[in-house]
Every structure is written in C-alpha cells, then in structure tokens.
C-alpha cells in the first residue's frame, strides 16, 4: 500500500516538474526557463558600464569647456547713441550754416524737407506730415538753388537719409533704397515717399491716381489748395509739400516773387484775376455776373457789374463779381511771367 502511495506521489512530482510546452510553439527569450538565445541588446551610451561609443555632442559655444567658436555678439547700443546717424548735416559743409537750407528731425516719421526756403516744419496732426512755412521771413541762400518750376525746389524723402539733400547729390533714402545707387531727384518734379495716399491728385505731370504702397509720388504743389479731394488741382505752383492724409486742411504760405492773392470782392463789381505760374498760356473764361471769373491760364476774368443773378466760369486767376449782376464780358488777360 505504501508502495502504491509512493508511486502516485512520484508520478505527480514528475508531472509537476515537467515544463509545459509554449502555447504558440516559439521559445520566449524573456522566460526564465526558455532555451531560446537571448535578444541582442543595443548598447546604451548613457549607461555607466556600457562599452558603446558616446553619442556625438554638438558643441555649445556657451559651455566653458567647449571648443566651438563663440557666437557673434551684437554691439550694445547705448540709449543716448540712438539717432546719431540720422542727425542733420549742413548742406554746404565748407561754410557756416546760417540759412535754413536743410532741416531734419531724427527718429521721427516726418518726411525730410530739403530746400532753400523751408524754415518751419510743424509736427504731424491728423496724419499731416508738415506744412511749408512762410519763406519771406528768411533771406535767400547763397548760392541759390537752381529751379525750373517757377517756384522753389524741394525734396521729400523719408526721415532716414544717409546723405544730405542737395542739387548735386540728390536724396538717398536709407530705408527704401538700401542696396541701390544714390537716387537723383529731379528738381523739376519734386518727389516724396508715402504709403497711404489713395486719392487722385493733379500733379505737374497731370492727373495721376495712386492706390497706396511705398512708392515715389510727384509732389502736390500749390498755395491755394484747401482740401485734397479727388480731382483737386493746384491753384498755384509756388510751393511743394508732402501730403500724408486727405482729411486735413492745408495752408501753405506764398513764396516771394509771386503775385499776391486778389482780395475777395464785397461789392457787385468783379475783381481782376492774378497770375498763375503755368507752363502754358491760357484764355479768359466766360465771366457771367456774380460768379468767379478767369480762364485756365495766367489771366483772370472780370465779373459783371449788376443785373440778374448768375454764375461765372471757373478760373485759376481770381474770383470776381457779386451775387447779383449782369452778364459781363471777359476781363483783360494778364501777360504770363517769364519762365526761368
């Protein structure tokens, strides 16, 4: 009986110690009793006992033991040194600068004005960059600047210019023309950069429309321009000024050498028109009583004395006549001034 119990125990122990075959028939290397070859282990460079070569480390210039070349350091700019590059320079370096020939405001968005008769540049207000002041309060420079426009040459680049504006060098804009050659600005057609003009202007070259973008535009000139609206023509080519907005009233003083503006008549009699610095001779327009008389040239018409209410023709010369008056004939045509 004992031998039978011992045989059963031996058989049970043999069955318990015999390893069971794998479920899928493939040896599992991770099993502790598996006879499969171990999996290849990849060397871990980060392990302290690993024999793998270390990973390539990128040189860090900021590391104290690095052999990499140092990074280029940007020069530190002191707060008091900003804007020194764009300070004003005399137009004529060989003589003392006394006349207001060159005016600049550094580190501002105001356009630069270079000319012989510019003495005041108001701060921007409502988008207006500046207004040319009255030049009669200051004497003409010596030597005078050449002109062939009937007025005074002006140049309107941006506020960052690497050279003074002069008839010999022109104007070089540092912001818009960094890699180009120095740009010579034609004095017969002064120019200024802008990026906000989206109106139609009448310039010296005619009516040209611009739709924005940083481009060089012909300067809008005139002393009687009140509001720059689409189709507005300059009444007199006696001054040049930059325009950055079309919603501000412009008032430009009259320069020496031009006729004064005729006084506004308060009676029914018409007033004779004034000169217009125009390249072409114009004819007198019809001057019906009460309206504005004048042609489209240097001459101005005369309004009628009395009669029924009428409206005169449009003219650049002068405004004559009262509200009531008879139809009057055209006034005398004034001779055009000699062109320079």
From Swiss-Prot:
It comes from Human herpesvirus 1 (strain F). Residues 308-326 have a biased composition (Basic residues). Residues 287-307 have a biased composition (Gly residues). Residues 13-96, 254-340 are annotated as: Disordered. Sequence repeats lie at residues 27-43, 59-75. Residues 27-75 are annotated as: 2 X 17 AA repeats. Residues 35-73 have a biased composition (Pro residues). This is Latency-related protein 1. Keywords: Repeat.
């Amino acid at each position: 009986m004992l031998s039978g119990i011992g045989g059963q125990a031996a058989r049970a122990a043999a069955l318990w110690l015999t390893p069971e075959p794998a479920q899928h028939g493939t040896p599992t290397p991770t099993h502790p009793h598996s006879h499969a070859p171990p999996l290849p282990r990849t060397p871990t460079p980060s392990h302290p006992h690993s024999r793998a070569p270390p990973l390539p480390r990128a040189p860090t210039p900021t590391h104290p033991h690095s052999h990499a070349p140092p990074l280029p350091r940007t020069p530190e700019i002191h707060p008091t040194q900003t804007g020194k590059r764009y300070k004003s320079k005399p137009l004529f370096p060989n003589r003392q600068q006394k006349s207001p020939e060159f005016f600049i405001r550094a580190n501002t968005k105001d356009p630069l004005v270079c000319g012989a008769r510019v003495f005041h540049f108001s701060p921007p207000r409502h988008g207006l960059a500046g207004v040319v002041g009255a030049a009669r309060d200051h004497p003409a420079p010596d030597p005078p600047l050449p002109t062939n426009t009937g007025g005074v040459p002006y140049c309107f680049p941006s506020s960052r210019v690497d050279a003074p504006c002069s008839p010999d060098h022109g104007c070089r804009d540092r912001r818009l023309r960094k890699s180009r050659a120095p740009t010579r600005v034609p004095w017969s057609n002064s120019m200024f950069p802008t990026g906000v003009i989206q109106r139609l202007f009448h310039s010296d070259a005619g009516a040209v429309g611009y739709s924005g973008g940083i481009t060089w535009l012909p300067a809008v000139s005139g002393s009687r321009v009140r509001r720059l609206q689409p189709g507005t023509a300059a009444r007199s080519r006696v001054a040049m000024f930059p325009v950055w907005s079309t919603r501000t009233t412009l008032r430009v003083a009259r320069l020496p050498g031009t006729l004064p503006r005729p006084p506004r008549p308060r009676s029914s009699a018409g007033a004779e028109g004034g000169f217009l610095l125009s390249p072409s001779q114009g004819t007198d327009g019809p001057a019906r009583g009460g309206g504005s008389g004048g042609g489209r040239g240097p001459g101005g018409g005369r309004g009628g004395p009395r009669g029924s209410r009428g409206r005169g023709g449009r003219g650049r010369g002068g405004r004559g006549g009262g509200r009531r008056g008879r139809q009057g004939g055209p006034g005398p045509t004034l001779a055009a001034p000699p062109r320079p």
